[in-house]
Amino acid sequence: MVILGVDPGLAIVGYALIEKQGNKYRVIDYGSINTPSKLESVDRLKIIHTDMVNIINKYNPDQMAVEKLFFNKNVKTAIEVGQARGVILLAGSQARLKIYEYTPLQVKQAVAGYGRAHKSQVQRMVKALLNLNEIPKPDDVADALAISICHGNSYRLNRKWGTKG
């Protein structure tokens, strides 16, 4: 199963493609979609959508896992992330991908074993679980890898116990 994990944002979208076979993960690719701050929001969203469609077409993932929007004290940031999530979800839906969403707490729990783990703890676990030489940068990319791992673990358990992801 090939999983496309996405950490949404307007400035930087982290993405990661991993293959899960049994209890093992293999990294296919990861990176970021960066949008220039000088552009209007609508143009930045267009870049995100176009690039996400291209990534989906290139790698043909089986499923998509996206971080859920959590309440942010900065309303402007929350709106921008929500808009980015919208075009990301649209790209996945247009490709007829099964889309799963996970909260930051669920991702931390699945990857580090503790829902309140610090970002650095999650990043070290991502590095270890995927046998990477270093923690991927920027943080958004490491987060996308963590989201992919979270889905791989959660999907396996949900299939076993018949619960909804």
Swiss-Prot record:
Where it mainly occurs, coarsely classed, is: cytoplasm
Subcellular localization: Cytoplasm
GO molecular-function annotation terms? crossover junction DNA endonuclease activity; DNA binding; magnesium ion binding
Q: Per the annotation, how and in what number is the cofactor bound?
A: Binds 2 Mg(2+) ion per subunit.
Sequence positions that bind Mg(2+) 2: E67
For this record, the Gene Ontology CC terms, alphabetical, are: cytoplasm; Holliday junction resolvase complex
Q: Which cofactor does it need?
A: Mg(2+)
Q: Give the family, as the similarity comment puts it.
A: Belongs to the RuvC family.
What task does this protein carry out? The RuvA-RuvB-RuvC complex processes Holliday junction (HJ) DNA during genetic recombination and DNA repair. Endonuclease that resolves HJ intermediates. Cleaves cruciform DNA by making single-stranded nicks across the HJ at symmetrical positions within the homologous arms, yielding a 5'-phosphate and a 3'-hydroxyl group; requires a central core of homology in the junction. The consensus cleavage sequence is 5'-(A/T)TT(C/G)-3'. Cleavage occurs on the 3'-side of the TT dinucleotide at the point of strand exchange.
Q: What is this protein called?
A: Crossover junction endodeoxyribonuclease RuvC
Listed under catalytic activity are: Endonucleolytic cleavage at a junction such as a reciprocal single-stranded crossover between two homologous DNA duplexes (Holliday junction)
**Key words, A-Z:** Cytoplasm, DNA damage, DNA recombination, DNA repair, DNA-binding, Endonuclease, Hydrolase, Magnesium, Metal-binding, Nuclease
Q: Which GO terms describe its biological process?
A: DNA recombination; DNA repair
Gene3D superfamilies, A to Z: Ribonuclease H-like superfamily/Ribonuclease H
- Where do the coiled-coil regions begin and end? none
Q: Which CDD domains match?
A: RuvC (cd16962)
Q: Which residues form the active site?
A: D7, E67, D140
- The Enzyme Commission number assigned here is 3.1.21.10
What is the taxonomic lineage of the source species? Bacteria, Bacillati, Bacillota, Clostridia, Halanaerobiales
Its signal peptide is none
Q: How does it assemble?
A: Homodimer which binds Holliday junction (HJ) DNA. The HJ becomes 2-fold symmetrical on binding to RuvC with unstacked arms; it has a different conformation from HJ DNA in complex with RuvA. In the full resolvosome a probable DNA-RuvA(4)-RuvB(12)-RuvC(2) complex forms which resolves the HJ.
Q: Which residues bind Mg(2+) 1?
A: D7, D140
Its gene? Answer: ruvC
